[in-house]
Amino acid sequence: MGIVGWPDLSLAQVAEEGDVSRVIVVPDPGAEPWAVTGVLCEGLDLVVHKGLGELSPTRARPVLAKVRGGQAALLTVGVRLPGTVTEIGAEVVAVRGVGRGSGRIRGVDIEVRVASKSARPCRGVLTCGERRARPRLEVV
C-alpha cells in the first residue's frame, strides 16, 4: 500500500493491526505528486492519493495509463480524476455525547453517498458508537 500527500494521516491503527513496513508513505511528494502516485501504481496493490481540486484529462492520462498497466487500485481523497468509476462521499451529520464545552464523543453518524457509472446513486447513514435514543425515519 502507498499513501501520497497525506502528512497528517495517523498510522497508529495500522501499527496496531498490521505490518507498517508494508506501507510506503510519501507525505510531501514535491512538485510532481501525480508522478509519484503513478510510479507507486505500477508496483503496489493500493495507492491512496490526497490532493485538492480536479485533475485535467491531460494531466490524468499518464497516471491512469500506469493504473491500467499495473495492478493497483487508486483511491483519491479530495481530488477528482476524469473517468472515475465510483465516487464515495462522506460527511459527519451528528455527534452524540458532547455537551457545551465538555463530555466525550459517544456516537457519530456519518452520511455516506456512493455514485457509480453502472448503478444509480445511493446514500445511507453509518453510526459509529452509541445510537440515537429515538431512531429517526430516513428515506434512503
Predicted regions mapped to residue ranges:
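N-terminal regions of ATP-driven nucleic-acid and macromolecular assemblies
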Residues: 1-140
